[in-house]
Amino acid sequence: TAMTRLTEERPGWYEGELDFKRVVLVPSTGKYEYRDTHFVVHCKAMSGQDCYDRMIDNLSERVDRRSQFPSPKGKNFRFRYLGRWK
């Protein structure tokens, strides 16, 4: 199942892709809006879930806290195992 694949421990490099709603300021109006944002990363992780957690931790420090992140189980998060680290 997708949940089993997400939590299966395979230490190594992962490519994670995340589509999320990012809050950004529109300079002309001074108001904020949600923008669809695609984020791709290569990271060392223990599982697909760990890859997701690392991505969210990284983004949470860099984007407006009102941004909306999808569930790791949904269609807006994808990952693939790239291989063991050396």
Residue ranges: model-predicted function:
Residues 1-9, 82-86:
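Short intrinsically disordered terminal tails
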Residues 24-27, 41-42, 57, 64:
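N-terminal non-cleavable signal-anchor helices
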Residues 21-23, 46-48, 84:
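Generic structural motif
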